[in-house]
Amino acid sequence: MSVFIDKNTKVMVQGITGSTALFHTKQMLDYGTKIVAGVTPGKGGQVVEGVPVFNTVEEAKNETGATVSVIYVPAPFAADSILEAADADLDMVICITEHIPVLDMVKVKRYLQGRKTRLVGPNCPGVITADECKIGIMPGYIHKKGHVGVVSRSGTLTYEAVHQLTEEGIGQTTAVGIGGDPVNGTNFIDVLKAFNEDDETKAVVMIGEIGGTAEEEAAEWIKANMTKPVVGFIGGQTAPPGKRMGHAGAIISGGKGTAEEKIKTLNSCGVKTAATPSEIGSTLIEAAKEAGIYELLLTVNK
């Protein structure tokens, strides 16, 4: 089993005729992702990389049966693209776009309440189920099938963690980038719940960063509900208060959201934390050995 997407997932690309979308569409197709449609208003009838282009999400869904969309639309128009995907009742929309205005996302989040469409992102690397389906911008080759779930606010730290695991012979089920913006769709707890219920996932790596309280809330949820070992890492440990570190959501304000606070809460809830990015893999191995599942996690031929 996998989380959110698998080899049978039919995907549409919103904004497919843009240069960034074209580049990543080719990468996703090469990985084996079933991209069945593209959407660019006014460009319906074209074919790019063998993928038919439609004017609307509704039309693309009806013609191809796509259930998931990935958005590479420029920031000023991205919120409308998410709303269009939700109106078409897609199962999931993965928004890669960065710099969407916060107020736009507040409206989107409100609009999605009570609807079936799950939003992942924005400002995220996407979702990948190893060796099956890649939706987003992550480097596919570092991901290998196995039993560790990865959930992260940071794209590049996801790649770092996955690469370390693969190098150690430890494969992954699904890696989910939830994005670095202050207002997003899917949060840590949503993904942790999915991993907890997934038979194939035996352990989880959770990567957070300064700003907000998402990691603290996740830690409390892990303590109360999680039946599998979780290890963590918090980015931004050297950040001074009030200084944004990369992501829009990565800022310490009002004394809240510090790395120190987050690490303390995670540790108190039984989550082992890596001190540096280079120790994420070894921290997971340590936790797996303690849980008696290390041998089970060795699925990649080194």
Swiss-Prot record:
Underlying gene: sucD
Subunit text: Heterotetramer of two alpha and two beta subunits.
Positions that bind substrate: 159
Organism: Staphylococcus aureus (strain MRSA252)
Record keywords, A-Z: Ligase, Nucleotide-binding, Tricarboxylic acid cycle
Name of the protein this chain belongs to: Succinate--CoA ligase [ADP-forming] subunit alpha
Active site annotation, chain numbering: 247 (tele-phosphohistidine intermediate)
HAMAP family found in the cross-reference section: Succ_CoA_alpha
Family per similarity comment: Belongs to the succinate/malate CoA ligase alpha subunit family.
